Amino acid sequence: MRVVSLLPSATEMLFALGIEPVGVSHECDYPPEAADLPAVNSSRIDATANSGEIDDQVQDAIDDGGVYEIDRETLAALDPDVIVSQGICDVCAVEDTEIREAVADLGLDAEVITSDPHSLADMLDDLERLGRRLDRPDRAASVRADLEARIEAITAQTPDSGPRVAVLDWLDPVMV
């Protein structure tokens, strides 16, 4: 089965399931061999700019059709059976609607699987859903069990209450 992943976390899941995608997002760099796969999209944003400039570029890109550009020629050449996308954030990765439009425009017979986790449990559920769809349900269950054991081991080593922590997602404008 030919799979394209447009989400770094999905790429990691695929490799954990023993599936090497035929194409990935420009941001997929783990495991290291993912970085050698064809990228089917690129960003219209200058990642070397400061956070205020990036925010301005993102707003302009949204007004001008999106933050990411799909390399339709590469996507067509890869002719995937399945494309893993995301539905969480319009600026974090290629929008689900954009990839569905590209699939339709190119006449590809590819199923788009959308990942939309809002919690760690949702991510683990996505792993199993992906495993079932790609005929790796036993491997997905095993990977999930290993991850849950690691989570439990870490939880057992941490105090019940810890310091209050705020995470700054972005500096300009401030996003907590």
Locate predicted features.
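N-terminal ligand-binding lobe of clamshell/alpha-beta domains
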Residues: 1-176
